[in-house]
């Protein structure tokens, strides 16, 4: 669970100590029901129970932490008819609640759009949503601008 008074960082997986990655893997095994107990999970991933309990509430995948939040997406799109509609349909199909849409006037065939969505009822992960939007022809760039609790 996120602590309101803590400082958080987004860190690339490749620079994390191995113990953190193993804690994440153990948590995934437990969440997916692939193991029934912490003892079994830590044994499979090769860490001690004390390491698991020390870090389990301090490390989690970024997209997992976006569940139940409001996220703001920034997109750079080609100026082609229907592209924004396709993106909004993809978001809607995940059961996300679209809160705001801001689109700038296209310049040089490119338009920038920001979309804020509530993620609590989504049927897909934020990562899957972003990957699906990236596959739309004409999407040049998509990134998460911000995230906040509600």
From Swiss-Prot:
Q: Disulfide pairs?
A: none
| Signal peptide coordinates | none
Name the Gene3D superfamilies on file.
3.30.70.260
Concerning SUPFAM superfamilies, the annotation shows: ACT-like
Q: Which residues form the ACT domain?
A: 72-147
Instruction: Give the family this protein belongs to, as stated in its UniProt record.
Output: Belongs to the UPF0735 family.
Record-given protein name: UPF0735 ACT domain-containing protein Csac_0995
Where does this protein come from, organism-wise? Caldicellulosiruptor saccharolyticus (strain ATCC 43494 / DSM 8903 / Tp8T 6331)
